[in-house]
Amino acid sequence: MDAIVRESHCRMIRHYRRRWGYPMQLLIDQACFGRTGPEALADDELERLHQDLERAQECMLEGISFEDAGLLRARYG
């Protein structure tokens, strides 16, 4: 992934966080556990987080919980 595409993913992740607030921050924190933030994710992890946030937005609009959508994962185990 080149630097421009990477920055585009980071920008969209920030957009989702600003628009939806805490629910999106929860998913971002889950993906970045043990790291300094989205910028520290590997390319595939960054792309996965962006995809998860797109799905999370759909869930919020459709009234589907993140648990039911499989977006919340166990941290240990």
Labelled PLM ranges:
Residues 36-42:
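A short, exposed loop/beta-hairpin motif centered on an aromatic-Gly-Thr core
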Residues 1-36, 47-77:
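Charged interaction scaffolds used for protein-protein
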